[in-house]
């Protein structure tokens, strides 16, 4: 049959299509240009923007150490006059011969702690020695920044916790009565200073070398090890970086004994235009001494030549763009709850300053960053040395002993935490803001945003280099202590993970179940209460025992005076006063000891039982052999012996028959 023919049954001719060569596949269509248009547009826009920026900005340092503690200062040169934007030099004050002082004071609850600062001011004077501007930290910290004139030249001295760092411009004489513009920036321990059109003077203190390699290496260092690295660097003499808790800006130098005489215009510090605030009679600004407001235009002391020189200098000089540590407002002692949600005044989009201590305040002891979702403690510490006079927590009523839930040390997860709306009160102020445990009625949250530790906000802000010395290490879990409000019965949850071992939470806190494999079935009747509660439904059929003193205390409520509380100074306690460590191995060690004792007891019982059975088996075989020998002897005995055995009931008929037979034969 030909290849293209049909079969005898009239089948269709399908083989020809299979037998012939396959046609070549069609060429792929050209890629559409429409998806590539956005990319091309972005490239064009980027090139145009780069050309525009390069025409107006020239960068001296492009290294931005976002992860470095003390990287070089990012400097952006702005050709537009800074103090003359809008055609004027800003608000101008004249300081008289008797000296004057303008003081801007931050509210106690809004004092910023910054890693980077910038200061710009215009002035004219004939003095060869005076203090223009000084920024001081809170009392007892010792951080400061001072702009002064010494021997006719401008200099800046500052200290952020390590040593005094000085930077000056010896080539520019500013005591000539002309208008000069000074720009200063600080990034950690590094600083730059520029006077008019002179080149930027940079200062890198000792201990700041290899910053680029450190910044690259820091990106690969695990977050939980960051503090260890910082400690090592600090021991090696690394410069501290945070200007802690800035309290006041003072202009005029009258308080320093070196009063300034002349004109000051358009002072700018970290987004604050202090002279403008003084002209507006801001409540945070106080003025004293021989002071006169000139206005927002150039002062009458400026000649036409001086003004022209100033404009040219401003066109040629640079503006150093810096940023400050990103932080949210914190609540310190005595702060009203509503200040939690208040925003810090920002007059410049390049600056974000706030009252919360940043991630590395180096000079203090404790700090409370905002809560995030990072590392947290399996070891919870709570100071219970000063118990409140009034009960702040309700007792914990345990469930039946078989299902007794206690926290074992895996760490509470988000399932055990209430939603953020429930965690934070409507007023906005966190419970741990600045109040003691006695008057705290809001959740105590153990967490960390950048550091992830347990924080106590009743203490001043701290730096991350010193913070870890007073608190234990952290893990990646979050634990929330519930609000200390009385509740009639506990709200037990059975679907969450567990928290720190041996930690007994308040009844309103979720009480999660034990994880799989963690339940102790050998010791079910061991609740964690000193005495059983007397409320309705409380179990009273067992004798409670006191757990080992390895957990933070829980304040007892009225009617429950025997709830256990931590007593760091009591016998058998370990650790510093006020901090009680929860040790993970306590439950496992107890279980291991109980298991060993039970196994030993079981082995002893098995051995005794075996010995008993072996002894009984020996005695039984002896009796059987003896009785068997007795039966065989009785069968072989004569008639006299048989007659002695006649009283036996089963032997009587046979013996009588034998006797009868004997009588018959006789």
Curated annotation (Swiss-Prot):
Stated name of the protein: Neurexin-2-beta
Q: Describe its partners and assembly state.
A: Interacts (via cytoplasmic C-terminal region) with CASK. Specific isoforms bind alpha-dystroglycan and neuroligins NLGN1, NLGN2 and NLGN3. Interacts with CBLN1, CBLN2 and, less avidly, with CBLN4. Interacts with CLSTN3.
- Annotated localization: Presynaptic cell membrane
- Residues of the signal sequence? 1-50
Described by its record, this protein's role is as follows: Neuronal cell surface protein that may be involved in cell recognition and cell adhesion.
Which SMART domains does this one have?
4.1m, LamG
The residues on the Extracellular side of the membrane are 51-590
Query: What family classification does the UniProt entry report for this protein?
Result: Belongs to the neurexin family.
* Species: Homo sapiens (Human)
Q: Which GO terms describe its molecular function?
A: cell adhesion molecule binding; metal ion binding; neuroligin family protein binding; transmembrane signaling receptor activity
Q: Which domain of life is it from?
A: Eukaryota
What are the BP-aspect GO terms? neuron cell-cell adhesion; signal transduction
For the region Disordered, what residue ranges are annotated?
Answer: 1-30, 327-346, 412-443, 479-580, 633-666
Cellular component GO terms held in the UniProt record: cell projection; plasma membrane; presynaptic membrane
**Could you tell me which InterPro entries the record lists for this protein?**
ConA-like_dom_sf, Laminin_G, Neurexin-like, Neurexin-related_CASP
Q: Which residues are noted as glycosylation sites? A: 190, 354
PANTHER family noted in UniProt: NEUREXIN-2 (PTHR15036:SF52), PIKACHURIN-LIKE PROTEIN (PTHR15036)
The residue spans the entry assigns to the Cytoplasmic side of the membrane are as follows 612-666
Q: Where is the composition biased (Gly residues)?
A: 1-10
Domains: entry comment: Alternative splicing in the laminin G-like domain regulates binding to alpha-dystroglycan.
Q: Where is the composition biased (Pro residues)?
A: 21-30
The UniProt transmembrane annotation reads 591-611
